[in-house]
Amino acid sequence: MHLESIVLRNFRNYENLELEFSPSVNVFLGENAQGKTNLLEAVLMLALAKSHRTTNDKDFIMWEKEEAKMEGRVVKRGQTVPLELAITQKGKRAKVNHLEQKKLSQYVGNLNVVIFAPEDLSLVKGAPGIRRRFLNMEIGQMQPIYLHNLSEYQRILQQRNQYLKMLQMKRKVDPMLLDILTEQFADVAINLTKRRADFIQKLEAYAAPIHHQISRGLETLKIEYKASVTLNGDDPDTWKADLLQKMESIKQREIDRGVTLVGPHRDDSLFYINGQNVQDFGSQGQQRTTALSVKLAEIDLIHEETGEYPVLLLDDVLSELDDYRQSHLLGAIEGKVQTFVTTTSTSGIDHDTLKQATTFYVEKGTVKKS
């Protein structure tokens, strides 16, 4: 899979831009604040209809314009697939093969991407919400039904929280409704939990040998999905019963606080090196090796799930890695994955992958191919 071309209209600082790309490595070179990251963000938006930088759609639209628009030609399984995404003040519209998609969940998955940006180095050390967003993004593009389930979960969670808030304020409401909402909540929660736990298991299978190699055989990586339920066995019905029992035991606490205290929105993923929790005890080098291992594992996992390698976006991350990790990253993708790199300079990075890359110079919203 690769992105053959992209067209941007009124997106960020690009009023009218058309680019054609190499199916191997493309480097966007330029000083800071010139628009390099905006280009990678456009590719990410074209793939996922979401950004790694903001959730406010207005941020994408050029000042005093009505809408931003992205078009791309994706080559997958030997076929060219046109993608279109328009962003207005009222929301997004998406097309695949020039056909309007009723839901964004039907659009996502036509272009698979893995992004590695400086903020991804906090995937290991950062707040649990960062890891939950990571799971939602990665599972969602491989299994679009996951996005539908996630949307349903968020809808029921919001309803349940509103009801708990009314109970907290001692308003007159039907006492049976909480039990009905809890049952609905548990059904969707276990669906998400199962998909996340399965993903983490597969991710570890790829990430562990990569981490072992990068650490020169000194470290063993384990990844655990820390769920609100006890993940004994593979029976979702048992998980659901455990969740319902837990929710019954904390019902009064939830009413007192007016919020749902358990579920996938409170779950986390934990990383262990040689049995030690990396979040709490890992060095900065170990945290970066773990993040790099996870990102490289994503590439192989998406290939396993979809039959094609994703597009890799490296947003100013090479400067955050030492020479050894740089070399391992570039060596792992060489000749295998279409890659987009943003950087202020390639000097000091001695690797054939960049030497053979197609280079674009970015300055004040203009892009010139070398």
Curated annotation (Swiss-Prot):
UniProt subcellular location? Cytoplasm
Q: Where is the signal peptide?
A: none
Please state the protein's primary subcellular location.
cytoplasm
Q: Name one GO biological process term.
A: DNA synthesis involved in DNA repair
Superkingdom is Bacteria
For whether the record's keyword set contains Nucleus, the answer is no
Keyword Repeat in record? no
| Pfam families named among the record's database cross-references | SMC_N (PF02463)
Task: Give the UniProt entry's GO cellular component terms.
Answer: cytoplasm
The UniProt entry's sequence similarity note says:
Belongs to the RecF family.
> What name has this protein been given in UniProt?
DNA replication and repair protein RecF
State which gene encodes it: recF
